[in-house]
Structure formats: structure tokens, C-alpha cells
Swiss-Prot record:
Protein name as catalogued: Elongation factor Ts
Lineage: Bacteria, Bacillati, Bacillota, Bacilli, Lactobacillales
Annotated region described as Involved in Mg(2+) ion dislocation from EF-Tu, given as residue ranges: 79-82
A Gene Ontology term for the protein's cellular component: cytoplasm
PANTHER family: ELONGATION FACTOR TS (PTHR11741), ELONGATION FACTOR TS, MITOCHONDRIAL (PTHR11741:SF0)
Entry keywords, A to Z: Cytoplasm, Elongation factor, Protein biosynthesis
Cell compartment(s), UniProt: Cytoplasm
Record has Protein biosynthesis as a keyword: yes
Alphabetized GO MF terms: translation elongation factor activity
Family per record: Belongs to the EF-Ts family.
Top-level taxon of origin: Bacteria
Organism (species): Leuconostoc citreum (strain KM20)
Role, per record: Associates with the EF-Tu.GDP complex and induces the exchange of GDP to GTP. It remains bound to the aminoacyl-tRNA.EF-Tu.GTP complex up to the GTP hydrolysis stage on the ribosome.
Amino acid sequence: MAITAAQVKELRDKTSVGMMDAKKALVEADGDLEKAIDLLREKGMAKAAKKGDRVAAEGMTFVAVKGNKAAIIELNSETDFVAGNAEFNDLLKAVANTVVEMAPADVEAALALEVEAGQTLNDKIIGTSQITGEKITLRRFAVVEKTDSENFGAYSHLAGSISALVVVDGASEEAAKDIAMHIAAIAPQYVSDAEVPADVIEREKAVQLASEDLAGKPDNIKEKMVEGRIKKFLAEITLLDQAFVKNSDQTVAEFIASQNGSVKSFVRYQVGEGIEKKVTDLAEEVAKQLG
């Protein structure tokens, strides 16, 4: 199949390999981006690429807590300048408080909620857009519930560019916040290895088995080396197996155990993750404005 320049660019952006290497991998993978990434990794030419590495939209994330419910939201704007102003921040908190109180099923349902007489949440967002001169959108949210014996931990990093919300059982709010801080900083994908889907593990195993540095090694040696690499891979993506950000001498599992608690669930949002950023040529923009 024909490989486009856009496909080559996307693969290069995700793996930092040369143009010809990217094109060859895409040809071999019949244009499948994820398969091409795996092929490059097998050749030792690219580091593991995470989906959604390219961050695009501006905006902020925020966590609102009300009793046994909490909501984490992402509100997007076109520029970080608007994301930092008072009108946007007021809207951010208003949206989060509405979502945590009403617990809508999805974004569409949230936008239809009546927040004031005759005014929906969408109307409120549009009103702020008119004030700021930029398009503002509610991209996503999650509403999380806990029991009376559990605690929420919430943490926002870099002025709201990243937020994390965690539920712990048995441990204090302070311990929960420390774990939320870890989640914001280290970005685990799952609580424990038991949550990692089998296909994710099988894919990683296939990549490692095909690695060129294992070629020619006896099967029993190869199997042991791959087993070790899978263990390392799981430790990198699962919260409980990661070195605790506040004390690298212990894992998160060891920390929460020392607090007589356990981690039930978590949500982590980073502004714009998974959305490709529009790159603007400043000189071209100025030229257009000058006519």
C-alpha cells in the first residue's frame, strides 16, 4: 500500500527515527502505525511509544470533592493565556462543582444540565467563550464515589495541567494525597499487574521475543530474559509496583501497606493528552494579519 508523508511524520514524531527507517517500517507494517512502532522496537531503533504522547490542547484540569463523591474534569481553551485567566478559572470550578453534584452520564448530558434559571452548563461555557474570545470546551470528566471508610486523595500539578484523583481504603487523607501526587508525577496506567489486560502483556512479550539482541540465544535463556523484561515493563506501568515518588527506597505498595491501607482506584488527566497540537508559523500569521 502507498505510505503517505503524514504517516511517516507521525511515526517519526512518536519514535524519533529517521525518515527512511520510518517509511520502511510502515511499508513492512502495511501502514499500521502501532505495528510499525513494534517493528522499530524489535530492531532496537525506538523506545516504547505511548499512545497519546503528543499533547495538543491548552486548558486546565480540576478535582472537586463533595462528601463521598468527587469529579475530575478537563476544560480546554485555545491558548494557555486564556486558561490562566480569572474567567476561565471561575468556569472551571463551576463546571467541576456542577458535575460532582449532578453526576451526569457523559459530556453531552453534562452540557444540558440547568445551572441557573433558563441557563444550561453549555450556555455558561459559551458565555465565557464570548468574554475570552476563544473556544472553550468540556472535553471529559469522571465522577468517582467512595464509602465512608475510604478517603479521596486529590492533587493538581503545574497549575492544573495535570490532576490525579485516587480512592484509598484504610489510609488517611494525607496518605491518599501523597499517592495522588505520585500518580500525577509518574503517570501509572493501572493500579496493579492484575488489572493489565492480557493482550497488552502478550503484545509486549511478542516485541521482546523478536528483539534483535535475543537472536541466536537458546530458547530457555531467551524465555528467562523476556520474563525479566515483562516484569520490568509491568513495574513501569502499574502504580503499586512503582518506586514511591516521595521515597524511592519503597514501592507504592509498601508505602500504602505501612499506612494500613490499600488503593482502590485512580484517575489521572493531563491537559490535551491524545490530541495533536496545531503548529502555527508565527511569521506567516503576522504576514496574514498585515495583509
